[in-house]
């Protein structure tokens, strides 16, 4: 019997997902300005806001989002956020490091959030839009698993943005509902 090494490796404590079939996407501030309430000229266009590492095999996706501890005029760093194109596809998020929120929005555009920290596990119903918010002072890492046929519907969130923003003022979090 032949014993093979894994094709993909995830250093849970200090690293990212690595392997020949792993894709990496980097979101810079220049491409994320519309995610925030206002543009912050003090944030460089080249500032890395977050990186997503993903691996897909036989209909299942495995990913890691690494978010930087950046605020935009006090607005905590967020991911783009999306609904799934196939609303019957659910997703799992697991906190791997740092701290933040999983912001969820239903189809009537009402929001609620769950605290995410190392070790927390979050089930996301396919009918909920979801985005991550880094509320801490360190990198925020979240592992995710979803079916590859889920798709990402970013336009729906662009047309009907999340109705909640999380700000940091003097180290304290402030939630603003729009």
What do these predicted regions represent?
Residues 5-8:
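N-terminal leader/propeptide segments of preproteins
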């Amino acid at each position: 019997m032949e014993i093979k090494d894994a094709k993909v490796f995830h250093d849970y404590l200090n690293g990212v997902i690595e392997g020949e079939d792993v894709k990496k996407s980097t979101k810079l501030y220049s491409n994320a300005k519309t995610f925030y309430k206002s543009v912050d000229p003090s944030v460089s266009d080249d500032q890395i806001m977050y990186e997503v590492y993903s691996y897909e095999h036989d209909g299942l996706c495995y990913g890691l989002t690494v978010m930087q501890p950046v605020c935009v005029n006090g607005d905590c760093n967020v991911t783009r956020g999306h609904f799934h194109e196939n609303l019957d596809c659910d997703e799992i998020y697991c906190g791997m490091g740092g701290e933040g929120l999983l912001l969820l929005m239903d189809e009537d555009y009402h929001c609620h959030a769950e605290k995410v920290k190392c070790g927390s596990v979050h089930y996301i119903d396919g009918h909920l839009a979801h985005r991550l918010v880094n509320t801490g002072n360190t990198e925020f890492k979240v592992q995710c698993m979803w079916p590859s046929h889920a798709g990402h519907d970013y336009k729906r969130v662009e047309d009907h943005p999340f109705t909640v923003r999380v700000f940091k003022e003097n180290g304290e979090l402030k939630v603003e509902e729009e």
